[in-house]
Regions:
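Beta-strand-rich recognition/accessory modules
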Residues: 1-99
Length: 99
């Protein structure tokens, strides 16, 4: 998935945790804000205001990797972006991120 991080600076990964017979859903969502109440996101200056009649465009590209070479290429691109930076995984919501 490719998108402009300056225009879509937030990214959410979520899953539906209902029973398996109900189906399993996961979401990977670039966004202008986090999935919190609008008032909370507004307080944290993450609400994009669009004037009446105005539009805002975002570009998003999704690639499907159908063979080992394509998968290896995607893995290399990710490794190049990560460099030597280790991932940070938090055990609890961080201040300012979650209502």
């Amino acid at each position: 998935m490719f998108f402009n991080k300056k225009k879509l600076p937030c990214y959410s990964v979520w899953k539906n945790t209902t029973a398996s017979p109900d189906g399993y859903v996961t979401g990977l969502e670039p966004a202008t804000n986090f999935p919190n109440p609008r008032t909370y996101e507004g307080e944290n200056r993450r609400v994009l205001n669009v004037a009446p009649g105005a539009t805002k465009e975002f570009d998003l590209r999704i690639e499907i990797h159908t063979d080992p070479a394509a998968i290896e290429g995607a893995e290399k691109a990710i490794a190049d972006i990560q460099g030597d930076t280790p991932p940070r995984v938090y055990d609890a919501p961080q201040p300012g991120w979650c209502a």
